[in-house]
Amino acid sequence: MDKKKINVAIDGTSSSGKSTMAKALAKSVGYTYIDTGAMYRSVALFCLRHGLITDGKVDVERLLPMLPDINISFKIEDGKQITYLNGENVENEIRGLEVSNNVSLVAAIAEVHHAMVRLQQEMGKNKGVVMDGRDIGTVVLPDAEIKLYVTTSPEIRAKRRFDEMRAKGDTSVTLNDIIANVKMRDHLDTTRKESPLRKADDAVEVDSGKFATAEEQIAWAVDYFHQFMQGK
């Protein structure tokens, strides 16, 4: 008998492997994957391109009237999800260190956060969605049937991001740069006033450092999903 679709909320710290896990889980079970981090990264890129970030501060007064001009969409190309900002493929650019260093500043702006949450809730209203981010289980989809919270040490997470960047041919930053970035983002994400990163009371905590490979982490998530569905 075909089970009714559910929503899966995956939260966690930066570079914890949650997006890779969420993406693969969605593909495995035939659900839609929503990369909320890419949405905030796109807004950060927009701000950088328009000179709205100076000395670690966002010019909110200038940004707010421009928010309606920011159109973010996703397309599947060659089996991969690509992020578009106002019709332009920005998938690679939003993963760079400059955007990484500024995305938490942008996500902390209440008006930006509210606009993104509205869009994300609209995407999840018909179920069958796997969504990952910082506040999916606590704010965006508080009624999600499955909630996971993924994290591990800053050093393990930084090495993972470093290896990803090297694999793409990006040699512009050192491992120490990325460790510093990860720790800074942890601090900003957990202490921000607007919807700080925290584990939902009913979320299952996943230590991604205990998995030898990303494939092991994905296999665990897929198995967990199927066990949950069988128990419904």
List where the protein language model places each region.
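Walker A/P-loop
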Residues: 19
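Hydrophobic anchor at the beta1->P-loop junction of P-loop NTPases
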Residues: 10
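P-loop (Walker A) phosphate-binding loop of NTP-binding proteins
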Residues: 13
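N-terminal phosphate/diphosphate-binding loop that engages ATP/GTP or pyrophosphate donors
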Residues: 28-95
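NTP-dependent small-molecule kinase module
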Residues: 85-91, 100, 159-171, 187-232
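ATP-dependent NMP and nucleoside kinases share a basic, alpha-helical "lid"
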Residues: 91-168
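ATP-binding Walker
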Residues: 16
